[in-house]
Regions:
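N-terminal accessory segment detector
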Residues: 1-39, 46, 50
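Long, amphipathic alpha-helical coupling/dimerization segments that relay conformational signals between
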Residues: 2-15, 23, 71-154
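Hydrophobic transmembrane alpha-helices and their membrane-interface boundaries in multi-pass
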Residues: 24, 34-91
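Amphipathic alpha-helical segments in well-ordered regions
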Residues: 28, 47-58, 62, 113-117, ...
């Protein structure tokens, strides 16, 4: 991956590097299933792409200091969709027979992959970089919570 402009925001990076991120997601997801067919992998990728799009949307939402504080205490984002791609993902993982632990591991792997791919392009850690990481973590945590909630109701 080539070096990006040092001012590249994390949400922009996710949008422009979806292919690399999805390859990482696919590699990890394949370790969770034995004998996964190509159709199933394409379904996995579709939901992963939708989750990435929702993460970016969440990260780009303007937030007041009060909204930031409320989110840090577990309140959902005001812009959060009632039925998210992460909800669907949790349901599909339940029907696939994936364990609760494996579901959580997917989001852990997604978080690590995105940050591992993005951070080498950031020569200096600035306040904005840290804020981007916080927003990303909040968005990932909210997506994980959606997946878990749907998984648990089954």
């Amino acid at each position: 991956m080539k070096k990006e402009n040092q001012k590249v925001r994390l949400a922009t990076f996710i949008e422009t590097h979806q292919k690399e991120i999805l390859i990482e997601w696919d590699s990890f997801a394949k370790t969770l299933f034995s004998g996964v067919d190509k159709f199933h992998i394409s379904l996995l990728r579709d939901h992963a792409r939708e989750i990435l799009i929702e993460l970016v949307s969440e990260m780009e939402q303007k937030e007041s200091p009060q909204q930031q504080k409320a989110k840090s205490l577990g309140a959902p984002s005001p812009a959060h969709p009632a039925e998210s791609a992460a909800n669907v993902h949790g349901l599909l993982r339940y029907h696939d027979g994936l364990s609760f632990t494996s579901l959580a591991a997917e989001f852990r792997a997604l978080r690590a992959s995105v940050l591992r791919l993005w951070l080498p392009n950031i020569p200096v850690i600035t306040k904005q970089v840290l804020l981007d990481v916080v927003r990303f973590n909040e968005a990932i945590d909210e997506a994980l919570a959606d997946s878990i909630a749907t998984y648990e109701t089954r």
